[in-house]
């Protein structure tokens, strides 16, 4: 598969749930064959690189969760958002939510 699919985690240094999720979010993401991109809002260079992806989903950032995981294709190029996982979840549920997004993306080619 030539797909460049990634999970972009938007989080904040002072977010306790974000920190807790970091014990397994990257591992689960990579086990599912996706790249993991960690974007902390305080890291302006990295945030600037992926800001457009976040603003496409949340134009004013008000409804985003902490953390917000956006599953997307070609995150550095003509990206397409496939789905999202918002907030903190136990490891098993986080995996299930990512798998559900991937299954939908495989079944329904987006228009």
Question: What positions do the PLM features span?
Answer:
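Thiol-based oxidoreductase modules, predominantly thioredoxin-like and allied folds used
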Residues: 10-11, 32-52
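Non-catalytic, surface beta->alpha helical segment in thiol-disulfide oxidoreductase systems
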Residues: 64-110
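Local sequence-structure signature of Cys/Sec-based thiol-disulfide redox active-site neighborhoods
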Residues: 1-35
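Catalytic cores of transferase enzymes with a strong primary signal for eukaryotic protein kinases
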Residues: 36-40, 61, 70
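Chalcogenol-based redox active-site neighborhoods
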Residues: 16-26, 44-45, 49, 53-64
